[in-house]
Structures are given as structure tokens and as C-alpha cells.
Amino acid sequence: MSPTGFFLLTVLLVLVTEAASRGPREKFSQSAEDPYSENMNLKILASGRGSSSTFGAFSRSENSRSNFKSKSPSSITREKVNEESRSEMSSTSSHFGLKMRRSHGGGEMNPFETKVKTRITRK
């Protein structure tokens, strides 16, 4: 058995034993805490036995992003955030895709805040 096959089999075994060890009450309480858990259906489609392409195909429910609504109140005001030029970023932060940003509030300059830029693509 190849090391990749052994690793995938071990991960599958851990996932199955964790799912079997949960009781029905714990599953219910988890779904009550996370309202989006029922919309996030992640399925593994096995395309070949023992091959590395076993975990290659995933499908996600179509309505998971379309049903998303922000729970934050509309009265919260957000400060404008200006993105600094790329030349002012350090080489280590640009290596990891980090952007340095500065917020202006009330005429005073706040310390720089590092935020990770993530992209969400829709299918």
C-alpha cells in the first residue's frame, strides 16, 4: 500500500469513528448553534479505488451562499479603510498575501492593521 493510500485510509477511518461516536443529541445541538450547517453539504465522490483521485471531486449545495444574510445590525458604521501601496509592504507580508491597511478615524492615525485578503468565488 502506498503512503498516500495509507494516509487517505487513516483520514477516512478518523472521520467515520468521529461521526459514529457522536450521539443524536450532540448532532442536534451542533446544528442548532450553526444555522448554515444544514446548507453546507459536502460529498466525497469516489472515482477510483486506491487512487489519488478518490478525493478529487466535491459537490456543495447551490443554495448555501444564496441564503446567506448578514446578522449584524445596520446601525453599525464602518470606518473607511485605505489600502497602502505595494511598495510599503514588507517582503514577508507580501510573500503570504497579506495587505497592510490603515484606518482614518477622527483625524488621528491608528496603528497599521494586517488583514488577510481572501477570495470567495461563486460557482
Curated annotation (Swiss-Prot):
Residues 50-123 are annotated as: Disordered. The keyword Nucleotidyltransferase does not apply. Testis. It is found in: Secreted, Extracellular space. Residues 64-75 have a biased composition (Low complexity). Residues 77-87 have a biased composition (Basic and acidic residues). GO terms for cellular component: extracellular space. The keyword Signal applies. Induction: By testosterone. Residues 1-21 form the signal peptide. This is Seminal vesicle secretory protein 5. Belongs to the SVP2/SVP5/SVP6 family. InterPro entries: Svs4/5/6. Transmembrane segments: none annotated. It comes from the Eukaryota. Keywords: Secreted, Signal.
